[in-house]
Amino acid sequence: MPEPHERRTRICHPITRAFACLCVLFSFASGTMAGEVSIGVAANFTDTTRELIRHFEAETGHQVSASFGSTGKLYAQIRNGAPFDVFMAADVFRPELIEEAQAGVNGTRFTYARGKLVLWSPAPDAFEDAPRYLEQQPFARLAIANPKTAPYGLAAQQVLEHIGQWQPLQPKLVRGDSIAQTFQFVVSRNAQAGFVAASQVKVWDEDAGTLWQVPQAYYQPIDQQAILLNRGASNEAARAWMDFLKSDTAIGIIRSYGYDQGHDAIN
């Protein structure tokens, strides 16, 4: 007859094996349920993205790593191998280039927001008639984003061309690498006014300073598109993020930050 300690050993073996199997299964399930997605996002969408991420992570368990910058610079980084799964641009042009270069997944490109451009000064009563203010130039510096790399900068150039002030204002223009830097120029008073995203002013304090909502007829619509990159093609978290951007929750958040439309109204 076996000794008592031998019986205990034989009884424990099946239990230990079962427990080990459960641990393996739980580990496998956890790995498939939660993943990570890396996204490159246009600078104007920084605050909106951070709120979207909070909701997405709470709903799905997936984790999001976000990098922010000008659309042009993010595009260049992606073409040079930056490890992004999703590209969220502030224009249509660069996502189209990604698609044409077969660096993105066909059929995934869509417009997630339409931006609005404003002329803003943190000083109260800085101007009453914005076009006249720009013509008279009672300021030392006017901030815009770099038109070559930032869609909001290109829109600002279009506005100034529309009112005939692009060339006259050249000596006073200070250009930010991104719309985020442009906004900082104005907030820090390094520029007395600037063309920025309406969403930035809304987050800062939409009742502070002086604001001109630029008529849409003065610049091409700032349709902001996202595309799933090849790196994220088989990433469940990346595809979940793309789906989330089209959800009612995301559209509501996007609109609350001052963007005209979400996915359902544009597509």
Regions found by a protein language model. Give the residues of each.
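N-terminal secretory signal peptides that target proteins for export/translocation
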Residues: M1-P14
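Sec/Tat signal peptide C-region and signal peptidase I cleavage site
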Residues: S30-A34
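Short N-terminal or domain-adjacent regulatory/targeting segments
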Residues: H13, L25, P124-F127
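Exported/periplasmic ABC-transporter solute-binding proteins
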Residues: G35-G61, S65-F68, G72-A82, A89-V92, ...
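Bacterial N-terminal signal peptides
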Residues: T16-A29
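Beta-strand-connecting loop/turn residues
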Residues: P14-I15, G115
